[in-house]
């Protein structure tokens, strides 16, 4: 009593306390960062190594394996995958959430150093690492185009000046430059001319290397002067290499230009990038795992004007893709939804209380509670994101509930003629414990979420804490500011005021009278209600088992990614044509705004595309509908497949794949894996629950297998080293020398001119100089035949791995797909030597599925414990919790009705319902217990009176929660696919719960009261206290 009186009779102090809460919240709001979702990125580090010309199997055994053994010893590595292709190896290390990325990077560098002695000596550089996940979609893509500059010059400018500058911006983890390669002097050899002159490829390589050196020459000095010695020991352009003497034949000089075509070109000609049908260099910018995407993008945009000034006028720098506009639009939609929810909740209060003065009170209390929450969010290091703003939207209904319970009870005393200050004090005292019980039991629902580990726990923690803080502030404000405002603002009702909104008032009275009559009938037929309650419990179980499930709702971020996979023997020229064809098909779609893509590098038969869709208000289809439409058109393109997927804000794992979900096959027996992977992939491709099934195992690449006759080689004076060097010199784009320039270093690349390698007969023109100086054709000591070879070799841990990727067809859920895959694996009878498991997001889904039921049970148990402590009873918490089955049925039926799968967002809705629907029972039970203690009523009379007296606040709180969630259901625009499942779950649960719990709660109350009396040692005792 004294606590409430302290605030009621000191209005200035109470107002200033509320102002302080509001001011702190405003300051916190201004400093909160903006993000699509809470920070849930795993720390990921990518290690890269190269050995030009080495086969995928050579890279895997000689480069990947030594590095994996060393990197695998690092603490906190949750997953290690590697992919080795022609001349390159990439190892992805994913760490535990709590692992510091900088500390992990130091450990990675130490592991690389430890493995250095085990790596091949011919590697052009040491392995490097980057603190970025290559499988993440870029947060921004910049393109460079020009009508005058070559692709090599554009690439040089991008990699030398733009990429380093952008990499220094806070939050940027990696800037990947694609579409070409650095400038280089290319030496294209003529095998026949070399043979005629008696010059070997090694002779050419040695001559070029010796002619271009960069060594210190020292200095000269006398008594007064000092001269630095400088020589013309470097050759920098193709024109300078052309006249280089590489050999003497019969006294005549053989110059490089006599046996080769020397051009200023690029290091790797098998690279191509495009933007909207125009050749382009792409700068794909990815953020650090812990960075905020909006802040990083804003920093890059702020830097762009400065970068524009350094660019020649003939180079056009454009933003081809930016993730931030859809994120901002999504957050604006949530903010609008929040405002609408507040307005609707206040409207509910006005309709029920029929007083403008009374309505002002929640109109003040709700903003104070919500705004004050921003301060706590800032102190906790949270951000303004879809989940935290949705938590505040839902909190609108919760925070007004506390105010409604206090306000309605005070209003009831005022209507009975009590003076305002006395009514405020008496009304608050009566419901203070009720409000405390409602708030504490609601916060208790989220305690299991705070203890939940892994990605789901990290994702839900921000939601739970934000909502809990809002409820805590609401509890404080409702017991301080609300009674003070009631005492000083409200007046005793007058007859003319009671006539306002007569229609709604009469309707409410009629509803209450009808409810009273129906409740009397129900209390006389309790067994029937018991059967209904048991039926809802059984229906809950059946609906949960049968409803489709997924991890997270499919988002429409306005960005698509596409992976091209062509025939494994395709040439680069043909692959570039496929890229152009696919880009034209997509560019012609009316919903597409921009298309960029690239192909080439170590995997000639693959490519990537990044597609920006038009804003949601300029297109009628969702991203998935656009993908479905494009899939039909793209399927008509022969010789290649383009797999499209919508970019999501949550992506788990470091595997780069052509689809959203992965299923990984592991084996220590590589032969068994290669045997069973095609069988499994073909089987999965027939399943209607899966779409776009593809694999990263490609074993049918064209290979030319050379078999040396070692006896013949020994007789001819040729060793294997010389023969292998010949092949590397001829076909490996071998980097044989370095050209040093002020801004960068460039390479001299030697190979047989592509004009002479158009078919297999090119091998017949190759020759080796033996130890006697004679030219011996390769065909003298080697035979060759075409064969199949892998284009890549993949590992997970230290086991051979193959990952099958898939998307979900429209109308199918991840639970449907995972169940279908499990059935297919069983039907195929896959041997135990080949192990299959879900990876990435699909793996997290499996883990979440296993913990969902435990989480719900833990939440219910926590609420039971809190209620038991508050009521000092084992029984009354069960009465209150009996409201939950009907809410679960309503939520699951609503999801089924809207064809929405049960996702992590729907799970949040279920957890919220546990907290919401029990409020009705708390109000009933509190007043029934009070009536039994002080009114000398029987249990049946007490619960009946409690139901009627609390009918109005029950309706008010339920409608407030319902109207607070309704905008989530009806919202459209960006991010609606996240908001709608939450709103659907809450609205469906509230409607069903309201229909049933008004009858089931009093029946359960009476049932447990009879049970208590039956087992009580003191039968005459009426109430358990």
Curated annotation (Swiss-Prot):
Transmembrane parts of this sequence: 3-23, 333-353, 360-380, 387-407, 431-451, 463-483, 528-548, 853-873, 875-895, 897-917, 953-973, 984-1004
Keyword terms of this UniProt record: Cell inner membrane, Cell membrane, Membrane, Transmembrane, Transmembrane helix, Transport
Gene3D superfamilies, per the entry: Multidrug efflux transporter AcrB pore domain, Multidrug efflux transporter AcrB pore domain like, Multidrug efflux transporter AcrB TolC docking domain, DN and DC subdomains, Multidrug efflux transporter AcrB transmembrane domain
A cellular component annotation (GO) from this entry: plasma membrane
Major subcellular location class: membrane
InterPro entries noted in UniProt: AcrB_DN_DC_subdom, Acrflvin-R, Multidrug-R_MdtC
GO molecular function, one term: xenobiotic transmembrane transporter activity
Induction: The mdtABC operon is transcriptionally activated by BaeR.
Annotated localization: Cell inner membrane
Organism superkingdom: Bacteria
This protein's record includes keyword Membrane: yes
Membrane keyword on record: yes
Pfam families named in the record: ACR_tran (PF00873)
Protein topology in the membrane: Multi-pass membrane protein
Function noted in UniProt: The MdtABC tripartite complex confers resistance against novobiocin and deoxycholate.
Assembly and binders: Part of a tripartite efflux system composed of MdtA, MdtB and MdtC. MdtC forms a heteromultimer with MdtB.
The family this protein is said to belong to: Belongs to the resistance-nodulation-cell division (RND) (TC 2.A.6) family. MdtC subfamily.
Protein name: Multidrug resistance protein MdtC
